[in-house]
UniProtKB/Swiss-Prot annotation:
Biased composition (Basic and acidic residues): 72-98
Signal sequence interval, chain numbering: none
GO biological process, one term: translation
Compartment(s) where it occurs, according to its Swiss-Prot or TrEMBL record: Mitochondrion
Single GO MF annotation: structural constituent of ribosome
UniProtKB keywords: Mitochondrion, Ribonucleoprotein, Ribosomal protein, Transit peptide
Subunit comment: Component of the mitochondrial large ribosomal subunit (mt-LSU). Mature yeast 74S mitochondrial ribosomes consist of a small (37S) and a large (54S) subunit. The 37S small subunit contains a 15S ribosomal RNA (15S mt-rRNA) and at least 32 different proteins. The 54S large subunit contains a 21S rRNA (21S mt-rRNA) and at least 45 different proteins. uL22m forms the wall of the exit tunnel.
Organism from which the protein derives: Schizosaccharomyces pombe (strain 972 / ATCC 24843)
GO cellular component entries: cytoplasm; mitochondrial large ribosomal subunit
Pfam families associated with the record: Ribosomal_L22
Name this polypeptide is given: Large ribosomal subunit protein uL22m
Transit peptide extent on chain: 1-22
Amino acid sequence: MKYINQFMKISKGFLVPSSTIGLNSKTYHYKFPLLSFVREFSNGSYLRESAQNPANLGSQKGSDIFSMLANQKDDSNRQQKEERVKERPRSRISFKKQETMDPSYTLQSMVLRSSLKKVGALCRQIAHKPFYHALLQMKMSDKKISKYIATALVSARENAVREAGLDESTLYVDQIWVGKAKYLKKLITMGRGGRAIERSPRVRVTVVLRDERALLRDLQRRQQRLERKKVWTPLPNRPIYLKSNFFTC
């Protein structure tokens, strides 16, 4: 009886008096929203659980019934979504992700007392060059900061061979860039008792080394991209109709 009363409270907005169905000495008939609710409720697991545990039948609330129905819908939607994801074809791996899959070694140098412009020109000089060619360029350069960049290159080579297992004979500088470090500030005295703060720039150099394996994979990707490209076909030769004697856009 408790279960029937709770069911009546839940469905109060969906039932109207009639002589069709008798519940608790009152007659009601279904509206359309209640009909769908009864169908889902009769097919759910709530009735089976209540039949197994009749003692707990009157302890359930109306909100629990609706929440159980909502959970059943969520579970079915989740299963359908997982099936669609499994059937979906595997997406193509992006070029940036393929670069991270290749073996490489990254090293950041110590803080160097120089400006971004001066070090940036030297880094552009050795970017995408073989390792020993880049090292020779830094050793033969007359710039003061070049010897510190050469030291960073040597340290990167030793760590790349020992830790990353790269081939020393086929190393090349894949990327090299400059980043700003914390500037040094100094209080200086100027004329007529004036003072100012002198800022000395400092930078860090980051170098990425790769070997021949990554270079061959890159060439293979480029070749595959050219092969997938649609072949260009010229337009057919056709006569010009309605030709005018003056220029038209």
